[in-house]
Amino acid sequence: ANPYQLATVFTSETAFNGNPLQSSSTIGMNPNLKPEKTSSIEAGFEAAFWDNRLYLDFTYYKTDSRNQILKLATTAASGYTSQVRNAGHIRNRGYEIQLGAVPIQTSKGFRWNLDLNYGANSSKVVKLDDEGLITSYQLYSSGIQILASVGEAYGTLFGTSYVRDANGNVVVDANGLPKISTTNKTLGKFTPDWTGGISNTFSYRSLSLSFLIDASVGGSIFSNTNKTGKYTGVLANTLSGRDAEHGGLWYYTDAMGNNVRLPESPSYSVSSDGLYYAQVNGQSTRVYQDGIMVEGVTESGSKNEEVVSAEKYYHRIYSIAEANVYDASYVKLREVALSYRLPRLWTQKLHLQEASVTLTGRNLWTIYKSVPNIDPESALTTGNAQGVEAYSLPTTRSFGVNLSVKF
């Protein structure tokens, strides 16, 4: 354990009236902390056939981690808001498979190496305290919660959701906007269901070309970029419903403040300040073309027929965490490399045993992803806030030249 978690220490503050001032933490330290413990078992086998032209490597593992050091809430009467203590039992189990083959190998120097790998991991929070009183521990909270909850996968995403009826239809309120749940629910987990990759290397005499494709399937990500982008209307996918050209419905607001959909595009005029007017019931009335009709049902179960402005709709889903949680699956062309091994006659003149030049490129192409506008590998931190993205920069492609020499 960190030695600063074993005893209360004081922090120097700005002097008061020339007198030294120190403050103590609101976190109660614990001199009885124990080291975290991890026990694991692993079993596997390797097999090779046809002079190593085909090989298989399989591994199964099970890992139990206990005595995690957590900051748990405590009564304020103790003088602290939380206390450091040992708690938690997390179990991980999974398997990894690697399959390799040399499908083609000729006497003229051509060779094709193929490698496949696949891995799946399942995590479960077995318990958080010995007494069984704590059922959930918050790892992160801002717009959405990342939790360790007993009986669930480590790192579940927990937040507000759409209200739905028994048939799964979104329920709208009296104004035609999606209703927000009054209680939070599990919206996913940040760990993938499985990961895998395929690597190919084609070599012919002194030339070699290789490429790597990897994939991650399953898992969820909460995107603050998409959340805020919808609210402010700066994303291309929020053009939907903004005007008639992008599917917006024409409507006007009656004397009672209700939006009334127009059956068709009206014959309108545009005022000097850019507002639209049309004849409605024999009167010149301001009309709008940014109407959206949410696909859903009313609280009574009838089909929704209320029109809302695109602005109000996108502002509403800003507050619904479920609307901003996406599938984090992806398939990427991770790396391509072209290598040339210099002729031995050249290397001998340079007093070298071997030399090669390699051109490389990384993160060249995202073949598939589900989440828009961001890289699904983006993360707020590498710690407990995995599964949360916040205004991340685009992933960069990189290119390089490597010179390898052997004396």
Model-derived regions, located:
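Extra-cytoplasmic beta-strand recognition segments
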Residues: 196
